[in-house]
UniProtKB/Swiss-Prot annotation:
The lineage of its organism: Bacteria, Pseudomonadati, Pseudomonadota, Betaproteobacteria, Burkholderiales. GO terms for cellular component: plasma membrane. This is NADH-quinone oxidoreductase subunit H. It is found in: Cell inner membrane. The keyword Transport does not apply. GO terms for molecular function: NADH dehydrogenase activity; oxidoreductase activity, acting on NAD(P)H, quinone or similar compound as acceptor; quinone binding. The gene is nuoH. The chain crosses the membrane at residues 25-45, 91-111, 126-146, 170-190, 205-225, 253-273, 290-310, 330-350. NCBIfam families: PRK06076.1-2, PRK06076.1-3.
């Protein structure tokens, strides 16, 4: 019996009928705290990694090797005043930052950390994740409109156009996963990648979806970078022409909430990519399966997050028209064609996804 099973059994005996509610709240709080810590140190890792790419040290003053820098940043933002523009719509202006964070946290309800370790093991988990993660753009639009600033509103309009352009391609990439796994349940999708010719010979990583669905994997991940408004797709903020886009009139913790949502969404995109295409908690080789599955999931997510940062440090920012062209004229045709190819592949004698 695992530690969580022991706690669950002991709590049920102690609190009786109230325990399921208490246990659900405890699990939600634990996941939320872990995500917040991951965001804090993801920002530090980003600054460190980009510093090394620039041949400099990065943050190294607060605490040993700069490890307390995230805490100093949080304290600074907590102490800053939230200054509201006089022409802004008060309540919408204040609600918008909260609306960006809530969907980012809500997606974690269906992401499995390892077998049987998920907050809500729902059968439509993939559909839920895609629907919830798409809501955040409405908060960006709301922030741009409520600020009553032409720069903020222009950034919000860019966010809407960018979301529409890349959401369709992401949707088709996820349709391919649904076709091959035959389920919308994220745990079952991971399970569908744990069998096949290569998995039977102990080489698990060659049975994961990244290999047969490589175009969809690339489209999904690059579209995820665009959906999170990360460099080189950060025209929503557009420092060179619209200063900071929808965030230009925000300060203090209201400003910090937008960045919190951005980094949580980075982790969400990486976690979903690892779950859908990289085997989730599955070990790359059978002889390593004794290591807890959550370790492999964290390792894959960390690697994908490092790619996020590497892309930021490497590529110049695209023009707005180039971003639209990539979404509509490259990614959308590629995913549609690959849906057709995989459909015929599954109906042929060469079908590798036979259950």
């Amino acid at each position: 019996m695992s530690l969580f099973d022991t706690i669950n059994a002991g709590g049920a005996q102690l609190l009786g009928i109230a325990w399921p509610t208490v246990w659900a709240i405890v699990r939600i709080l634990v996941v939320a705290v872990v995500i917040l810590l991951c965001v804090a140190y993801l920002i530090l890792w980003e600054r460190k990694l980009i510093g090394w790419m620039h041949v400099r040290l990065g943050p190294n003053r607060v605490g040993p090797a700069g490890l307390l820098q995230p805490i100093a940043d949080v304290l600074k933002l907590l102490l800053k005043e939230v200054i509201q523009p006089s022409a802004a719509s008060r309540w919408l202006y204040l609600i918008a930052p909260v609306m960006t964070v809530v969907p980012a946290f809500a997606v974690w309800a269906v992401i499995p950390f390892q077998a049987e370790a998920v907050l809500a093991n729902v059968n439509a988990g993939l559909l839920y994740a895609m629907a919830i993660s798409s809501i955040g753009v409405y908060a960006v639009i709301l922030a741009g409109w409520a600020s009553n600033s032409k720069y903020a509103f222009l950034g919000a309009m860019r966010a809407a156009a960018q979301m529409v352009s890349y959401e369709i391609s992401m949707g088709f990439a996820l349709v391919l996963v649904l076709m091959t796994a035959g389920s919308l349940n994220l745990s079952e999708i991971v399970g569908s990648q744990q069998h096949g010719f290569f998995a039977g010979h102990g080489v698990n990583f060659l049975s994961w979806n990244w290999l047969p669905l490589l175009p969809a994997f690339v489209v999904y991940f690059v579209s995820g970078i665009a959906e999170t408004n990360r460099h080189p797709f950060d025209v929503v903020e557009g420092e060179s022409e619209i200063v900071a886009g929808h965030m230009i009139d925000y300060s203090g913790m209201a400003f910090a909430l937008f960045f919190l949502a951005e980094y949580i969404n980075m982790i969400v995109i990486s976690a979903l990519a690892a779950t859908l295409f990289l085997g989730g908690w599955d070990a790359p080789f059978e002889f390593l399966s004794f290591i807890p599955g959550v370790f492999w999931l964290v390792l894959k997510v960390f690697a994908l997050l490092s790619v996020f940062i590497w892309v930021r440090a490497t590529f110049p920012r695209y023009r707005y028209d180039q971003i639209m062209r990539l979404g509509w004229k490259v990614f959308l045709p590629v995913t549609v064609i690959w849906v057709v190819v995989v459909g015929f592949w599954m109906m042929s004698p060469l079908n590798i996804w036979v259950k």
